[in-house]
Amino acid sequence: MPLGANKVALFGVAGVSTGTAVLLSTATASSSSSLSFTLPTAYKQVTFGFYNITPATDGTTFEFQTSTDGGSSYGMTITSTNFVATHGEDGSNGRIEYVTAGDLAQSTSYQPLGLYVGSDSDESIAGELNLINPSSTTYVKHFYGKFNNYTSSVYTRNPYVAGYVNSTSDVDAINFKMASGNIATGTVKMWGIK
């Protein structure tokens, strides 16, 4: 969901440039164990839009990891931070907090994007993740994202996650999955931004 002059790309079709963003790929989950994308080399930024991603397992975590071998394996070293604003449907427990369960410190685990995602028919997670210069062989790969999810305990959670993949290797694939169970439904779109 690129902002500014790139907004028009939200309505584009794969491979058609509308401004500086190009919609490159769309993946739709249907009881999928994960959704993977091959990352392009021609873009300084890759942006992912997530639309109503619903888990099969109630209260699980939506997460990602990257690869340097075309997706044969996922487990690159990540350091990250994670904080969230939360508010209940009944007006209770409005707060902003750091989420230690959502950060990584030089870990090869999957990076959490949203915790406690609900699996009811009206529950899901939606948002945006930006990966900076994934094909660089000079710099680490910075990422930052913002999401909102309707939790299994009828709260809205608005997580913000940022960090870096601590590698100067070309990152060429990314994988999104739930920590437990399949992705029941939802769509992910990938844009390249020059």
Short names for language-model regions:
Residues P2-K194:
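Surface-exposed molecular-recognition determinants
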